[in-house]
């Protein structure tokens, strides 16, 4: 076993060879695919008469274009139906498992992998989706890849990559009331910048990270890419192992779990591992964070004032002016009181069961504001079923939320769930780019699920700490 960081160890464990161009060829332990980025890759294989090398290490789902209101086939959207049908044909020919809506296992690719135990410490994981870094929460090296790389992995079960530096981000202390993993990652991106992670992989550590459950760790690793990093990870620990023990992969095979656990423990970063950079953030100073602009790095604490562009670094000033104009905000204001038209609770960042529970604690006993249309889109069919078993669906529906089927939904404008005109959306998703939620004039405010819930019932961005929580049964 090599020494150093988890990144060093897992990289070396999976390195096949070093290529003439200096890149390393890595074996891929898990390849996740979906309906949007895989069709061209399969087409390129057919042109060359190449078969999928390891269908047993490839797993498919549908999430990006699948509707969340009515998933009956054929889909009303012809383009979406064509993508679904093409994926079905591709996986059938290759012998790849597909979690479609008929299976009870369908959902966002970065939700179903962990919940089924496909995601494990010490694995290399790739997917044609930028938020593949989510799986790093388990101590995996997980990378988003492009179509040509999807082709290469399908054909060879390997990928050529350049090794990056490692930045350790220590979040110390205890989080305050109403502060979540989403607030941690928005704070990190705000401080280091959306390009601050370029050339790096992030290792998240410190008391505040260690105290998070797996869902919180996934939220943080999920948005590593928004901070410019190639990937992000958390070292596996007992929290990780307890999660895995209950998944499909190990619930009925405890012996296999015990066989793999020593390897998982061995890939943890060594206490004396050397890092290329170390950043420390005091978690006790973080408050609920919301974005005021059109990048995830344009965020502030809920009590802070929107910055004046001239007070920002020179290369950020023009972007800030355009963002403030688009969002209709002014320097010196806070985001508290910003009117909201739509509340979206979902996405691969925040659509897991604890996310829904925490939002339901705010929603219970209250009603969605008259000016707001609100929806909850569970991250997977399993999350949806578990939430319904706990009665969370009733909490949301009684308050006036739409309770939807699983999918990516309003995180991106590739399906029926989109903003209209200049609607402002309180969103638990990961990106607030202009046009991201379907309308070029739409305005997205990123925040935690609890903050989305608070905005839904007040009709404006609201400090969730001002709203007493109700009890919901877990």
Swiss-Prot record:
PROSITE patterns: ACONITASE_1, ACONITASE_2. Pathway: Amino-acid biosynthesis; L-leucine biosynthesis; L-leucine from 3-methyl-2-oxobutanoate: step 2/4. It is an enzyme of class 4 (lyase). InterPro entries: 3-IsopropMal_deHydase_lsu (IPR004430), Acnase/IPM_dHydase_lsu_aba_1/3 (IPR015931), Acoase/IPM_deHydtase_lsu_aba (IPR001030), Aconitase_4Fe-4S_BS (IPR018136), Aconitase_4Fe-4S_dom (IPR036008), IPM_dehydratase_rel_enz (IPR050067), IPMI_cat (IPR033941). Keywords: 4Fe-4S, Amino-acid biosynthesis, Branched-chain amino acid biosynthesis, Iron, Iron-sulfur, Leucine biosynthesis, Lyase, Metal-binding. Binds 1 [4Fe-4S] cluster per subunit. GO terms for biological process: L-leucine biosynthetic process. Residues 293-313 are annotated as: Disordered. It comes from the Archaea. The keyword Iron-sulfur applies. It catalyses: (2R,3S)-3-isopropylmalate = (2S)-2-isopropylmalate. Its EC number is 4.2.1.33. Heterodimer of LeuC and LeuD. Belongs to the aconitase/IPM isomerase family. LeuC type 1 subfamily. This is 3-isopropylmalate dehydratase large subunit. The gene is leuC.
């Amino acid at each position: 076993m090599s020494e150093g960081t988890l990144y060093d160890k897992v990289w070396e464990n999976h390195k096949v060879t070093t290529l003439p161009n200096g890149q390393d060829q890595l074996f891929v332990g898990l390849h996740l695919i979906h309906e949007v980025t895989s069709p061209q890759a399969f087409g390129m294989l057919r042109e060359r008469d190449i078969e999928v090398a390891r269908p047993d290490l490839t797993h498919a789902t549908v999430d990006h274009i699948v509707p969340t209101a009515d998933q009956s086939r054929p889909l009303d959207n012809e383009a979406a139906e064509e993508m679904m049908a093409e994926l079905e044909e591709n996986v059938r020919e290759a012998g790849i498992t597909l979690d479609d809506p008929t299976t009870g296992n369908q959902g966002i690719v970065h939700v179903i992998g962990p919940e089924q135990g496909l995601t494990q410490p010490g694995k290399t994981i790739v997917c044609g989706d930028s938020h593949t870094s989510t799986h790093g929460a388990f101590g995996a090296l997980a990378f988003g890849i492009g179509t040509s790389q999807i082709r290469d992995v399908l054909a060879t079960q390997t990928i050529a990559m350049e090794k990056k530096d490692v930045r350790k981000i220590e979040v110390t202390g205890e989080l305050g009331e109403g502060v979540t993993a989403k607030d941690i990652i928005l704070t990190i991106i705000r401080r280091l910048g959306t390009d601050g992670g370029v050339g790096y992989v992030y290792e998240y550590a410190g008391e505040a990270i260690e105290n998070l459950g797996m869902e919180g760790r996934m939220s943080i690793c999920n948005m590593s890419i928004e901070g410019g990093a190639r990937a992000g990870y958390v070292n596996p620990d007992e929290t990780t192992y307890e999660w895995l023990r209950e998944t499909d992969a190990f619930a009925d095979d405890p012996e296999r779990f015990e066989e793999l656990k020593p390897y998982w423990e061995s890939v943890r970063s060594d206490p004396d591992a050397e890092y290329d950079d170390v950043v420390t953030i005091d978690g006790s100073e973080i408050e609920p964070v919301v974005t005021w602009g059109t990048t995830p790095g344009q965020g502030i604490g809920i009590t802070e004032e929107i910055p004046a562009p001239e007070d920002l670094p020179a290369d950020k000033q023009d972007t800030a002016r355009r963002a403030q104009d688009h969002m209709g905000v002014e320097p010196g204001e806070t985001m508290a009181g910003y009117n909201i038209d739509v509340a979206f609770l979902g996405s691969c960042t925040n659509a897991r069961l604890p996310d829904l529970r925490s939002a339901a604690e705010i929603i219970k006993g209250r009603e969605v504001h008259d000016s707001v249309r609100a929806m909850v889109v569970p991250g997977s069919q399993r999350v949806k079923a578990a939430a319904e078993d706990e009665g969370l669906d009733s909490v949301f529906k009684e308050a006036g939320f739409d309770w939807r089927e699983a999918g990516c939904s309003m995180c991106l404008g590739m399906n029926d769930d989109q903003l209209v005109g200049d609607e402002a959306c309180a969103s638990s998703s990961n990106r607030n780019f202009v046009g991201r939620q379907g309308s070029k004039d739409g305005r997205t405010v990123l925040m935690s699920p609890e903050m989305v819930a608070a905005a839904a019932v007040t009709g404006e961005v609201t400090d969730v700490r001002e709203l007493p929580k109700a009890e919901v049964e877990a």
